[in-house]
């Protein structure tokens, strides 16, 4: 970043300022809440607007908890290889209305992943074999 000229730095900062901390989506009949990290300091009464940047970007979710009965929580940030109760590490984890899509591309055997919210179809890159 420091090596960029001032005009390019400003473009990068403007690009980053346009990012949302979360997205709420309705796809078909299903509700989704997309965040990078988790819902730090979660309480059922807390509105999404009340969460801090740290809560949404850096907090790690509790994969044993169902946060919402009527909304699917979609997160990244925590590689699925590190979820203790995950029977299929390195693949998208789905349990308790939670979809974890960070499949550990930085780890040996990890991969990039995506999920189509309309169909549930999962997409993966090739394994990262180190």
Say what each PLM segment does.
Residues 1-100, 104-110, 123-126:
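Acidic, His/Gly-enriched loop-helix segments that form or flank divalent-metal centers
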Residues 130:
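Acidic two-metal-ion nuclease catalytic site recognized across multiple nuclease folds
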Residues 113:
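Hydrophobic/aromatic beta-strand elements that line small-molecule binding cavities or substrate pockets
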């Amino acid at each position: 970043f420091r090596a960029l000229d001032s005009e390019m730095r400003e473009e990068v900062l403007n690009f980053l300022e346009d990012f949302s901390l979360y997205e709420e989506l309705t796809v078909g009949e299903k509700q989704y809440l997309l965040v990078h990290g988790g819902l730090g300091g979660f309480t059922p009464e807390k509105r999404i607007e009340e969460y801090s940047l740290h809560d949404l970007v850096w907090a790690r979710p509790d994969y044993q908890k169902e946060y919402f009965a009527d909304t699917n929580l979609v997160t990244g940030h925590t590689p699925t290889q590190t979820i203790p109760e995950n029977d299929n590490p390195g693949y998208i984890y789905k349990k308790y209305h939670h979809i974890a899509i960070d499949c550990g591309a930085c780890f040996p055997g990890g991969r990039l992943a995506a999920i189509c919210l309309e169909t549930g179809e999962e997409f993966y890159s090739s394994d990262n074999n180190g």
